[in-house]
Regions:
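Alpha-helical scaffold domains
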Residues: 1-159
Length: 159
């Protein structure tokens, strides 16, 4: 978390971010805490940082993949980015529990923010059954999802 507070430029910060992501993050608390600390650091650099996140999603390190997912969850569930976020999330294939939970959590949060875009995405998704069911569970546990939407999502689980 100290890396997020370093008094360096955005360009100088990226190598610290990469090193932390690839070598220090080793559990969900490191991942989620680090991602939450980056708000001020990426402000004004959202588009370029969104591109930078691709490297984490493509990593062999499951914790780096989770960092990429949680960064998108925290900062990119907006109308401008959501279609690309869903596409990137859909492309992640992992058997690692915390990566899969990150996918489900991101999708449930995205549903709460923009149901219509997510509903369109669900018509052609490539999620594995476990992630899909977990997404539905997480969305149905959310107070931000309407009763009608919860019923709709539960109906998808049965298909």
């Amino acid at each position: 978390l100290v890396a997020a507070a370093l008094p360096v430029s955005y360009a100088e910060f990226l190598p610290y971010c990469d090193t932390y992501t690839e070598t220090i993050v080793e559990n969900w608390a490191h991942c989620d805490g680090f991602c939450a600390s980056l708000k001020k650091r990426i402000k004004g650099h959202e588009a370029e940082f969104f591109e930078h996140i691709k490297r984490y999603l493509a990593s062999e390190n499951p914790w780096a993949v989770r960092v990429g997912l949680i960064l998108m969850l925290n900062y990119y569930l907006t109308p401008a980015y959501l279609p690309a976020v869903l596409e990137r999330t859909d492309a992640v294939q992992s058997e690692q529990y915390y990566v899969r939970m990150g996918q489900a959590w991101l999708l449930a949060t995205a549903w709460a923010k923009d149901r219509d875009t997510c509903r369109a995405y669900l018509s052609h998704h490539h999620l594995d059954a476990w992630v899909f069911r977990k997404f539905i569970q997480k969305a149905c546990e959310s107070y931000r999802v309407s009763a009608e939407d919860k019923a709709y999502l539960r109906s998808l689980r049965k298909k």
